[in-house]
């Protein structure tokens, strides 16, 4: 420890020593018979104590939280027998041998320097009294001298009394603080030292060994410290620690061990490793119970739901069958197909009434059985779905006007959504991705988009949806005849990405239900949501796997085709007005593809505008679509119109599909030049986009003028056997007025209100809880590694009394930061794609972030316990468990926020690298003395380390005061800043969470 650092630390301790007039005066009062002078002397002593306490608090408050308490712990002797003995032996002259304020200042200034600098005027070159020897003192000659001057001391010199220490060159004595052991020394003839101290007396003099000669920090000298394994109730008594107790260095009393057998005689520490093991076992059992019971709770809840669902389905089926029978009987009676006599009619009437009564009785009993709200909701859902199936018309015969009529009752929930695009062009640099795309996507129809690979099918969908950041876009996109941004309508637009972006650690039903809850209309009842959910599950054929986990790459779940249908169902349950699908049938077999298309056609019957990119559909599947968009390379339209007219159109150009050829595949082969064919006139397959433009009267771009010149008799080509522009849309032109009336009616597409932030937060909270409970293995590994790290660091990096554990706590902060930060990456890194999809659909980022952070608070609260259960009991520091817990709680909270930020900013590999590197760098920066304080203040390890040091320093009192002040001064710490350090670390955690939230909002 540097001399300058020791100096300031020792000044604080030395000023305490000036207050030590109290013990001897108190003992002296016992010798005075007259109480009057004793009272006046006590008052003067109290005044001096208060004055010194105020001075110490002002100058050295950084190492003393409470001066009065520190005074009491250091110098309030409950047993002052050594003072009484001293007074008796000196016949009341002990007070004159005590050091004054000026002499104490000399002692303080000499700390950290050579002993030769510690001399008073009584021990200079001209005068060296006998009391100048270490461990010796002399009486004051002039009692009237000022406290600011060193009094003359040259008489009655003698060895220092037990319980006091006499510095070399001062000729006075100072009481030893509590926790010190200052007996009279004995001369060691072999070494010439005065045992148990480290000083020598002048050879050949008539002096003898006195008591201690110094009190300083433990690094400079530990001669006066009560040795470990012993306790010193007074500064002149030393006792062995008895069995069942332990005594640390500088102890004034024995500390009882919780288990007597863990502490043998002269034990210095309690064997707390056993308690750490017990706490680990308890923590493990609790965590296992929580995760296992919670997992069982999820399974039990799923079984209850399944039972209620089956029961409700049975009741709904029975009700539907009964209604069908009564309806048939009624029709037979009304049509007079059943002849009966009047008596028969009366009997039938009576029988009907009886059956009705019985039916009512049965319904009454059923209502009692359906008292549970869950079963009642499922019953209503299945009843509604059953009625829809009965009333559902044949999809192949429905017209657009029929679609409009069927969708009229749902328009309040699903407004009609028509998309018209005119001259849509998309480019990046000089490359054209889409060129002059004109047409429309109509509500109530299912449109297929096809074309060669690289023709721009997905790009076309993104351009229509407005997801064209970084591209140059020209042309118009009209929504119900009005110009506007598609992003404004994202709450009623469903987009199914090409990749199956679903949550693998949720079941099929949980994925769909979450989407239905968060994206449906705000006022939609739970019963209606269940109806929608059951309808989608039924239409997509997901009944058998509804309770199966979707699965991930690491953990197998449902099949790829089933996963694809779940991907589509996530958008269907929110009841969109516009449903866009990017290759929904990829990876599906023919049966699954047809099942999916039937579900999409059912959506179209509700007035939904459905558009899908398709690859190589079968002929049956192709004919299930209403409209067909064929894109050529370069993003040009080769055909856009009804499926029923596509072969007629291409036949008019001389392109006829051979038998047993699939029309869409044949047309794509023509566009790619794989199949050669001879077209009418001088046209070639590369001219198909140009011919489509000419046929519809679209403006031909300049770069296509040359191709236009290559075609002879273009106009004749279209006047002979070709369709008119109006005819190309078949049914659409037939009902144009009806569609226009329903699509253009004054209904705001922005009226749908989805659940607010708080409601979504609740749904997210439930989802994240289920995900965490299904990650029990990962959580267990995290806690196991923390416990192992605590054992290693607690065993190897011991907290030393001289440094208060600065080095070991640095390693501890690195380990906890690294492990908890890496674990926090899992909160956001694995779900980046899912989050993007949910955010683009209009779901709340704030609710998503807060829910994940809220669930992570469980780990924030428990992980410090897991780590301390091993570290604290294997390291056994002096600080209290609760103080350590508060520090590590703040630390885990802070680094978790940093982990969030890295998980959002970087890919998983880079985020892991940063999480491993940053804690090490920040600990090094925060502990280097040559780094500016401003820079160190920005490092959370600096504040965490200071809090840990302060937590330990508070437990060092009495003889440890100088050591405490020196250690705190060296690190620049303040013992009063424990709460401040905790608050700063927590605020850093809040700051990084705020940065992470902003990053989520801006993430592309």
From Swiss-Prot:
Domain ABC transporter: 419-659
GO cellular component term of the entry, any: membrane
SMART domains: AAA
Pfam families to which the protein is assigned, alphabetical: ABC2_membrane_7, ABC_tran
Membrane topology according to the record: Multi-pass membrane protein
UniProt cross-references to InterPro entries, sorted A to Z: AAA+_ATPase (IPR003593), ABC_transporter-like_ATP-bd (IPR003439), ABC_transporter-like_CS (IPR017871), ABCG_dom (IPR043926), ABCG_transporters (IPR050352), P-loop_NTPase (IPR027417)
Compartment(s) where it occurs, according to its Swiss-Prot or TrEMBL record: Membrane
Family to which this protein belongs: Belongs to the ABC transporter superfamily. ABCG family. Eye pigment precursor importer (TC 3.A.1.204) subfamily.
Gene3D superfamilies (alphabetical): P-loop containing nucleotide triphosphate hydrolases
Regions that span the bilayer: 271-291, 776-796, 804-824, 886-906, 907-927, 943-963, 978-998
Binding site for ATP: 451-458
One Gene Ontology term of the molecular function aspect: ABC-type transporter activity
Region (Disordered): 343-373
Keyword annotations from UniProtKB, A to Z: ATP-binding, Membrane, Nucleotide-binding, Signal, Transmembrane, Transmembrane helix, Transport
Name recorded for this polypeptide: ABC transporter G family member 25
Induction conditions: Up-regulated in shoots by cold, heat, salicylic acid and 1-aminocyclopropane-1-carboxylic acid (ACC). Down-regulated in shoots by mannitol, abscisic acid, kinetin, benzylaminopurine, indole-3-acetic acid and gibberellic acid. Up-regulated in roots by clod, salt, jasmonic acid, salicylic acid, ACC and benzylaminopurine. Down-regulated in roots by indole-3-acetic acid and gibberellic acid.
Signal peptide: 1-27
Biased composition (Basic residues): 362-372
Biased composition range(s): Basic and acidic residues: 352-361
UniProt-listed GO biological process terms: transmembrane transport
């Amino acid at each position: 420890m540097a001399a300058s650092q020791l100096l300031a630390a020792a000044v604080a301790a030395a000023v305490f020593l000036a207050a030590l007039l109290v013990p001897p005066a108190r003992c002296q009062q016992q010798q005075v018979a007259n109480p009057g002078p004793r009272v006046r002397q006590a008052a003067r002593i109290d005044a001096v104590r208060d004055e010194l306490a105020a001075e110490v608090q002002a100058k050295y408050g950084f190492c003393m939280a409470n001066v009065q308490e520190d005074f009491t712990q250091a110098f309030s002797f409950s047993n002052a027998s050594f003072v009484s003995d001293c007074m008796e032996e000196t016949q009341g002259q002990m007070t004159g041998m005590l050091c004054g304020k000026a002499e104490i200042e000399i002692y303080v200034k000499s700390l950290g320097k050579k002993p030769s600098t510690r001399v008073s005027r009584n021990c200079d070159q001209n005068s060296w009294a006998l009391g100048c020897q270490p461990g010796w003192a002399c009486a004051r000659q002039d009692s009237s001298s000022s406290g600011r001057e060193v009094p003359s001391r040259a008489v009655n010199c003698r060895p220092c009394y037990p319980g006091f220490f006499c510095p070399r060159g001062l000729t006075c004595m100072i009481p030893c603080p509590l926790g010190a052991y200052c007996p009279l020394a004995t001369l060691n003839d072999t070494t010439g030292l005065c045992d148990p101290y480290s000083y020598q007396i002048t050879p050949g003099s008539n002096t003898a060994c006195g008591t201690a000669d110094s009190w300083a920090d433990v690094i400079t000298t530990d001669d006066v410290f009560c040795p470990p394994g012993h306790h010193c109730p007074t500064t002149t008594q030393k006792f062995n620690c008895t069995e069942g107790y332990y005594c640390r260095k500088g102890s004034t009393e024995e500390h009882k061990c919780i288990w007597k057998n863990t502490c043998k005689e002269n034990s210095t520490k309690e064997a707390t490793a056993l308690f750490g093991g017990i706490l680990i076992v308890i923590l493990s059992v609790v965590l296992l119970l929580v995760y296992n019971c919670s997992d069982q709770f999820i399974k039990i809840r799923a079984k209850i739901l399944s039972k209620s669902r089956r029961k409700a389905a049975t009741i709904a089926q029975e009700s539907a069958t009964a209604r069908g029978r009564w309806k048939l009987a009624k029709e037979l009676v009304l049509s007079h197909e059943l002849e009966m006599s009047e008596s028969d009619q009366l009997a039938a009437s009576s029988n009907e009434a009886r059956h009705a009564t019985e039916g009512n009785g049965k319904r009454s009993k059923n209502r009692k059985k359906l008292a549970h709200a869950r079963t009642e909701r499922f019953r209503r859902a299945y009843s509604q779905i059953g009625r829809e199936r009965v009333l559902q018309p044949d999809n192949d015969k429905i017209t657009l006007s029929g679609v409009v009529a069927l969708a009229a009752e749902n328009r309040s929930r699903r407004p009609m959504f028509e998309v018209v695009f005119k001259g849509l062009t998309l480019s990046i640099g000089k490359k054209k991705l889409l060129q002059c795309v004109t047409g429309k996507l109509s509500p109530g129809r299912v449109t297929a988009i096809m074309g060669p690979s690289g023709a721009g099918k997905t790009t076309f969908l993104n351009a229509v949806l407005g997801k064209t950041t970084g591209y140059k876009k020209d042309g118009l996109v009209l929504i119900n005849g009005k110009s506007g941004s598609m992003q404004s309508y994202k709450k009623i637009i469903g987009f199914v990405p090409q990749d199956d972006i679903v949550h693998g650690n949720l079941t099929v039903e949980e994925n769909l239900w979450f989407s239905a809850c968060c994206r449906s209309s705000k006022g939609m009842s739970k019963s209606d949501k269940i109806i929608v959910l059951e309808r989608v599950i039924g239409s997509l054929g997901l009944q058998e796997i509804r309770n199966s986990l979707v699965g991930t790459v690491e953990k197998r779940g449902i099949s790829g085709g089933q996963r694809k249908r779940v991907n589509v169902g996530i958008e269907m349950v929110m009841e969109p007005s516009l449903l866009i699908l990017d290759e929904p049938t990829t990876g599906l077999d023919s049966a699954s593809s047809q099942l999916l298309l039937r579900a999409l056609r059912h959506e179209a019957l509700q007035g939904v505008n459905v558009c899908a990119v398709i690859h190589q559909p079968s002929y049956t599947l192709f004919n299930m679509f209403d409209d067909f968009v064929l894109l050529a390379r370069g993003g040009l339209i080769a055909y856009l119109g009804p499926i029923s007219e596509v072969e007629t159109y291409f036949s008019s150009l001389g392109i006829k599909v051979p038998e047993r050829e699939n029309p869409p595949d044949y047309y794509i082969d023509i566009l790619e030049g794989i199949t050669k064919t001879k077209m009418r006139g001088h046209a070639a397959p590369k001219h198909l986009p140009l011919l489509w433009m000419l046929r519809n009267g679209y403006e031909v771009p300049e770069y296509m003028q040359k191709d236009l010149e290559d075609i002879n008799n273009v106009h004749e080509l279209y006047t002979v056997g070709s369709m008119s522009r109006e005819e190309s849309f078949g049914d659409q032109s037939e009902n144009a007025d009806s569609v226009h009336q329903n699509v253009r009616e004054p209904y705001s597409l922005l009226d749908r209100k989805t659940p607010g932030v708080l409601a979504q937060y609740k749904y997210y909270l439930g989802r994240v809880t289920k995900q965490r409970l299904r990650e029990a293995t990962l959580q267990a590994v995290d806690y196991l590694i923390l416990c192992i790290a605590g054992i290693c660091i607690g065993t190897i990096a011991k907290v030393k009394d001289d440094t208060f554990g600065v080095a070991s706590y640095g390693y501890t902060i690195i380990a906890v930061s690294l492990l908890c930060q890496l674990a926090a990456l899992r909160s956001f890194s694995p779900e980046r794609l899912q989050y993007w999809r949910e955010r683009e659909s209009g779901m709340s980022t704030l609710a998503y972030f807060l829910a994940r952070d809220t669930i992570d608070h469980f780990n924030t609260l428990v992980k410090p316990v897991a780590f301390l259960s091993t570290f604290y009991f294997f390291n056994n520091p002096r600080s209290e468990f609760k103080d350590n817990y508060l520090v590590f709680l703040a630390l885990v909270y802070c680094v978790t926020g940093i982990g969030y930020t890295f998980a959002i900013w970087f890919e998983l590999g880079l985020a892991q690298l940063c999480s491993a590197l940053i804690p090490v760098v920040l600990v090094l920066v925060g502990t280097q003395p040559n780094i500016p304080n401003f820079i160190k203040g920005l490092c959370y390890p600096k504040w965490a380390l200071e809090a840990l040091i302060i937590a330990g320093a508070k437990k060092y009192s009495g003889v440890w005061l100088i050591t405490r002040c020196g250690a705190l001064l060296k690190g620049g710490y303040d013992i009063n800043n424990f709460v401040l350090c905790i608050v700063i670390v927590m605020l850093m955690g809040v700051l990084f969470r705020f940065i992470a939230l902003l990053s989520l909002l801006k993430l592309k």
